[in-house]
Amino acid sequence: MCIRDRFAAPAELMRDYEGWKTEDFEVFKKWIDKTFYPICDDFLDNHFNSSAISGWMSWDLPAMLTILSIGVLNDDDAKIKQALEFFYHGKGMGCIEWSVKGMHEDPAGKVKGRHLAQSQEMGRDQGHATLNVGLHAYFCRTAYNMGIDLFAYNDNIILDLCEYTAKYNLTSAEDVEMPFEPYYHPKYGWHEKVSADGKGRARPGWELLYNHYAKVKGMNAPYSQAFAEKERPEGYGERGTAEAGDLGFGTLLYLSLIHI
């Protein structure tokens, strides 16, 4: 995620800046491609010579987002296609079909006509589970800017993932009734219930997802809305921790998304 926010996206914004010489921009494009793409490509291809099913969503998604962002910056259709194909059909937890480990009715009845989607890392800890919200948000938004609506993919499954995650993390209390499908991880064994480790983790990303689904698509997203409002104004994450890797500032960027 940092590669997109710290290198690819700023470079994309500055590509027409008259103070950045064309030859220097071309050097930068070659540098970001040569430096970061091979690592991400190798990881998604063979997961550093380990089993794809022993990985995590939060490992695959940053590599996918990096490749997609480099593809956009360099007008490289092959890389864009590679990242999107992994989202659709990849062999790893970044594949949307692999990311979802259970579909559940909302015990509280607030999510109507839809399901809560249990993500792969909900049984691991909430630091990583909430990290995936932002990763999905930025990946989908990058594709959306190119006219590819991943937010809507598979009947808006990304929203269902976010609603499950938001519902559990709205408070630090542990008395939240959460349906859970047991999930077996080849290295760590069975996950029998939602992990309370890091519960209530406040990472950026909620403003983008909530405002897109609620304002652009006109959909009901009660738990994502509550989480976005709880954290508003969305800043730059918790400085000094891993959250500082998120771009953040979602309230500033996306609160008026309906007008964009």
Where are the predicted features?
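Aromatic-lined, polymer-binding surfaces characteristic
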Residues: 4-146
